[in-house]
Amino acid sequence: MRPLLLQVGIRNVNIGERVTCVEPCNLYECTIGDDSFVGPFVEIQRGVIIGKRCRIQSHSFICEKVSISDDCFIGHGVMFVNDLFKQGGPSGNAESWKSTHIGNQVSIGSNATILPVQITNQVVIGAGAVVTKDITEPGFYAGNPAKKIRSLPK
């Protein structure tokens, strides 16, 4: 029996002006706004919307049902999750998946994990943080689970 080899690369992507994508990457059926950057070894799945002037660093995974607004930074190895494994394992039913929305001017540090949440504008997420709940006010957040550790400077 021959193996099934799926090669995706960059397929059916709505790419804005002056976007840089470094291969190898796996981008399909998503939207990437003007002046954005996507590093190598990044996967961005169908339906994802990336705003303008965003930087997605290497080895990040952005799953279906994620939207990222303008002027955001996604550090190396950041993982977005849309399935909470409520049945003890992955759900093949996309209707049970949850969405994530990232506001404007959000920076997410390397190796953070973002569960299905809403994050407001002007937030910094520390490296390695696990965001399990909505973030409704600007500031610096870190830890597992992520908690506000200080406000942004005025």
Spell out what each predicted region is:
Residues 2-11, 21-32, 36-119, 144-145, ...:
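Flexible, glycine/small-residue-enriched loop-and-beta-strand segment within the central core
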Residues 14-15:
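Conserved N-terminal strand/loop that marks the beginning of ABC ATPase nucleotide-binding domains
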Residues 120-123, 136-138:
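Conserved catalytic segment of ABC-fold P-loop ATPases
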Residues 124-131, 140:
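C-terminal/domain-terminus segments
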Residues 133-145:
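Short glycine/proline-enriched turn or capping motifs at secondary-structure junctions
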